[in-house]
Curated annotation (Swiss-Prot):
Listed transmembrane segments: 192-209
Gene that encodes the chain: GEP7
Main location: mitochondrion
Record's protein name: Genetic interactor of prohibitin 7, mitochondrial
UniProt keyword Membrane present: yes
Protein purpose: Involved in respiratory growth and required for cell survival in the absence of prohibitins.
Superkingdom classification of source: Eukaryota
Length: 234
């Protein structure tokens, strides 16, 4: 009796039901396929709205980051973070070697520093704390990001000019290599125009050559004497 109850309570395998439906011609399989199609369609429709919602979420996250950064900047909390990270002995001046080794830091800190420097750039430079002046200067002209590898330490850092604006392409080895590479090669638009002009000239020259060699295209020009005949004396 117990064995019979245990067998009755066991669930029927799904594969067995599908085989039975195909064998008996039942519409259960068709209804299952239709329900799967409806679910997939609803999922596709939902994905159309997920893109806009993710964009709204990113915009809200950017606004939240900006508001949080400005709040920490005005309260002085972010200034203390900068001093603890980039200053050693003198709390009013950042150490250059600390900026060279630690800037811009993790992704979250980099985003906050970028928002803070953009916010401070609209304010009076003279009223800006000394540490923020240094961070803003290094953020704009430092050897990080696209200027990685350029020397920043010295009287006249590479890739930045204080008084002399001559010979910009000779300021550093990377700029000189870029200048020489760009001076030897044409840009894509100039190459396209040059190739098109060469193709048109070649087609015109070949057409002229074929016309000269084709006997059917040659004509004989008759020279007519159009001089008026002299009248005989009467």
């Amino acid at each position: 009796m117990k064995r019979t109850c245990a067998l009755a309570s066991r669930a029927v395998p799904k594969s067995l039901l599908e085989r039975q439906a195909r064998r008996t011609g039942s519409k259960v399989g068709a209804s299952q396929e239709a329900s799967k199609f409806v679910v997939a369609s609803l999922r596709d429709i939902g994905s159309l709205f997920s893109g806009s919602s993710s964009g709204d979420d990113e915009e809200q996250e950017a606004l939240r980051l900006h508001s949080d950064t400005v709040s920490k900047l005005n309260s002085g909390e972010l200034t203390e973070v900068v001093r603890q990270r980039y200053c050693v002995d003198n709390k009013d001046r950042c150490e250059t070697r600390m900026l060279l080794t630690k800037y811009p830091g993790p992704a979250r800190e980099r985003e906050m520093l970028q928002v803070a420097t953009a916010e401070l750039s609209a304010r009076d430079w003279r009223k800006m704390p000394r540490v923020w002046q240094q961070v803003s200067y290094y953020h704009a002209f430092g050897s990080w990001g696209p200027r990685t590898g350029l020397s920043f330490v010295g009287r006249r850092p590479e890739d930045f000019f204080v008084t002399d604006q001559k010979g910009l392409w000779t300021c550093s080895a990377p700029r000189r290599a870029e200048y020489e590479r760009s001076s030897r090669a044409l840009d894509p638009a100039s190459r396209a125009v040059l190739y098109a002009a060469a193709l048109v000239a070649a087609v015109a020259a070949l057409g002229d050559l074929w016309r000269r060699q084709d006997a059917d295209r040659q004509v004989t020009v008759a020279e007519l004497d159009l001089a008026e005949p002299t009248s005989s004396p009467t």
